[in-house]
Swiss-Prot record:
The nuclear export signal is CRM1-dependent. One of its GO terms (biological process) is regulation of DNA-templated transcription. The keyword Cell inner membrane does not apply. Pfam families: Herpes_UL47 (PF03362). It comes from Psittacid herpesvirus 1 (isolate Amazon parrot/-/97-0001/1997) (PsHV-1). Phosphorylated by US3. This phosphorylation is required for proper nuclear localization. This is Tegument protein UL47 homolog.
Length: 605
């Protein structure tokens, strides 16, 4: 929510040390300036009973295998014990896999008139980035009028200049969509080819997540054995090679699914469809679903959900570009952008965790159906069969800390980040609620539901989850490139959590069938070209301490959803590592990024 030229609020807190965090104490809201709660480090969480039971994985709710009690006797992958039915090579697991992997029939064929209607609906949305939310290959983009080429940057301020936001939206569209606009003209992809790509990408992503569980099992077993021995045992920190094995959220449901297992010699980042059409879609970035032909075939519910995600991220991407210089000049030694970078880094870590949570929920839902199929009760309705990712206790604990920290920062970018996060996190929950309601209605019909009928419901949910994951993956790459460029080229010193970088590195691998990450070199070159072509030159200006906001600025207001999520800090124990200087964190994890800050990646052509 934004208001023009509202009266300014006082800056609630300035964080000068990395070890301090704004939070809620003793279950009651305290004045923001009095908040002094340190980051809860993983090494300092003690022997909390819930965490000892694997609270961050929530095995009781998800009915998964407890990672802290993993022994050969109850490990289905270390013995011949079968769970949830017989999962032989030709058993129900393979049968289920064949149905899931069969060509989806959930995207309708549409004509140009329906596409034009969808494009008009999308672009008619009132937004502070209008009219630059248009599809860059459409008529409305080609007829755009002139705009300010000299936006003003207010570093780490409570307001953003309206023109700077529009320029940011323009640059974001050009940088992130130009390649797909050109590739689309050359390859002319169709709705059917897009559906086939999404179907194959979904199954490959499930293979990646499932196989990662198995490949990390030896590390998890070693950590579990060390814990049981009790001798000088400490929980792994994000710098430990075993940390991700313990801290990832992917659970198997105690079954062997041959169709989901990758050969041991196949790296998960190479499990991607090849060919020119797949390369176009994998390299499309945000443009894939900004393209109206990709949204028009969706059903009405999915159209609304996808539009909501695109609108929210359009504003945030524009706000990010409007908050920092387009060309860093490190010799100036300007540190006034570091507070806004601190906010972006905190949001980045939270958004990475949310994306991993949603991907884990999609894997969980897929395996849940397979397990019920093997047990022969797939046509029995169970309200808790498909877990809501928004009710993940690990996520809610971290939300309380991170959103409270963003809310206390007092910068416009922090508010936009918090509002965008609150909007994005509820969308997969809506899709899951719809799946559960439709599943219940299908099982109450007079006729017995067929396996294909119920799989169709799961496919509809999987379609939206896949779209959501694709857009979030491209957004996280965008945020990562902005942060890396600020630390490396801008010499900005701001804190970031190492755990966020490790999780993001793994997410890039897991989601490689959907998205090819953009290297920093490609990102910087595209941004430089867009700014040069439009002759954009920014000016940095401080906000004067008066009773009025500068003319032409926008003040964003925290949404009610953000305030509700902040209260989760009181209910759940957050598990977080201490932030560290960003430049050192990127150097530590850079090898895991495949050197992507130095050079490009294989674009999958």
């Amino acid at each position: 929510m934004a208001t023009d030229n509202a009266r300014p609020r006082s800056r609630s807190l300035r964080r000068k040390s990395m070890g301090a965090e704004a939070a809620l104490r003793d279950g009651a809201a305290q004045p923001a300036a009095a908040h002094k709660t340190k980051v809860i480090a993983r090494s300092e969480t003690g022997d909390d009973a819930d965490e000892d039971a694997g609270a961050d994985r929530d095995p009781g709710t998800r009915r998964g295998i407890d990672p802290w009690k993993l022994e050969p006797a109850n490990d289905p992958f270390a013995s011949n014990k079968e769970y949830g039915g017989k999962w032989g090579a030709n058993g129900p697991a393979d049968s289920a896999a064949k149905v899931l992997a069969a060509a989806w029939d959930i995207m309708a064929l549409v004509d140009a008139e329906e596409v034009a209607k969808e494009q008009e609906t999308f672009e008619a949305k009132t937004s502070p980035v209008s009219p630059f939310g248009a599809w860059p290959g459409g008529q409305s983009w080609r007829t755009l009028g002139d705009y300010s080429h000299a936006p003003i940057l207010y570093p780490s301020a409570e307001v953003i200049e309206a023109d700077a936001l529009k320029v940011g939206a323009y640059v974001s569209r050009v940088v992130q969509c130009s390649r797909f606009v050109a590739d689309k003209k050359a390859q002319r992809p169709t709705v059917r080819s897009l559906q086939s790509f999404l179907e194959a990408a979904f199954w490959r992503v499930m293979q990646n997540a499932y196989s990662t569980c198995l490949r990390l099992r030896p590390k998890l077993t070693a950590v579990s054995r060390s814990r049981r021995s009790g001798a000088n045992w400490r929980k792994p920190s994000p710098s430990d090679p075993n940390w991700y094995a313990v801290s990832n959220q992917f659970l198997w449901r105690g079954m062997r699914v041959p169709s989901l297992l990758l050969p041991p010699d196949v790296p998960i980042e190479e499990n991607a469809e090849r060919g020119p059409t797949a390369a176009v879609f994998r390299n499309a970035g945000p443009a894939l679903f900004i393209w109206p032909w990709a949204r028009a075939p969706l059903d009405e519910r999915d159209k609304r959900l996808v539009r909501a995600a695109l609108w929210a991220l359009d504003i945030l991407d524009a706000a990010i570009l409007a908050s920092f210089p387009y060309a860093w000049r490190p010799h100036v030694g300007d540190k006034q952008f570091e507070e806004a970078l601190d906010c972006l880094a905190e949001y980045f870590g939270l958004a990475v965790l949310l994306t991993e949570t949603v991907l884990a929920a999609l894997l969980d839902h897929t395996l849940a159906f397979m397990k019920s199929l093997g047990a022969g009760n797939y046509d029995d309705f169970e309200e808790d069969r498909f877990a809501d990712p928004g009710k993940n206790k690990y996520l809610m604990g971290v939300e309380g800390v991170s959103l409270t920290r963003l809310n206390s920062a007092g910068t416009a970018l922090a508010t936009v980040c918090a509002n965008t996060y609150a909007a994005l996190r509820c969308l997969p929950s809506v899709a899951t609620s719809s799946l559960t309601a439709n599943y219940s209605a299908e099982t109450r019909r007079a006729r017995k539901p067929t396996r294909e009928d119920l799989f169709s419901l799961l496919q509809h949910e999987a379609l939206f989850y896949t779209i959501w994951l694709q857009r979030m993956a491209t957004h996280l790459d965008f945020c990562s490139n902005v942060l890396v460029e600020s630390a490396k080229k801008g010499k900005q010193e701001f804190p970031i959590r190492r755990s966020a970088l490790v999780r993001h590195m793994w997410l890039q691998k897991l989601l490689s069938p959907l998205v090819v990450p953009v290297s920093l070199r490609d990102f910087a070159a595209a941004k430089k070209e867009a700014v040069a072509d439009a002759k954009i030159e920014t000016y940095v200006k401080s906000v004067q301490s008066t009773n009025k906001d500068p003319k032409g600025t926008i003040r964003f207001i925290a949404s009610d959803n953000v305030k509700t999520l902040m209260a989760s800090y009181e209910k759940y124990n957050p598990i977080l590592d201490e932030p560290m200087i960003a430049s050192r964190a990127f150097d530590d994890v850079i090898s895991g990024y495949g050197g992507r800050t130095a050079g490009g990646q294989n674009r999958g052509d």
